[in-house]
UniProtKB/Swiss-Prot annotation:
Highest taxon above the source species: Bacteria
GO molecular function: nucleic acid binding
Name under which the protein is recorded: UPF0102 protein Hac_0727
A Pfam family the protein falls into: UPF0102
Gene3D superfamilies documented for this protein: 3.40.1350.10
Lineage: Bacteria, Pseudomonadati, Campylobacterota, Epsilonproteobacteria, Campylobacterales
PANTHER family according to UniProt: UPF0102 PROTEIN YRAN
Record InterPro entries: Restrct_endonuc-II-like, tRNA_endonuc-like_dom_sf, UPF0102_YraN-like
Annotated source species: Helicobacter acinonychis (strain Sheeba)
Amino acid sequence: MRFFNNKHKEKGLKAEEEACEFLKTLGFEIIERNFFSKFGEIDIIAFKKGVLHFIEVKSGENFDPIYAITPSKLQKIIQTIRYYLSQKDPNSDFCIDALIVKNGKFELLENITF
């Protein structure tokens, strides 16, 4: 188990808050933040044009944050999505996205599983 100090947690929360604001400018409706299950966590769940977007937010300054989304992390995200949909609407169209925050800039990578 990894432990993070408060500074790291605050930085992550700030990045997620800024990410939500950025997503809203792109027409996303934020449905939920930090959804937890026994399988893992989804940073942001958003809705746009009839599709649920499960968004993993990664930030970094000295490395490319996309590399923090490992196959193991992606598997946990998928299990958490399955749980979420089983509780809400199993027939929803969805995709998994990554929102990369680096040096104050945002890059949305849609459908990262394909």
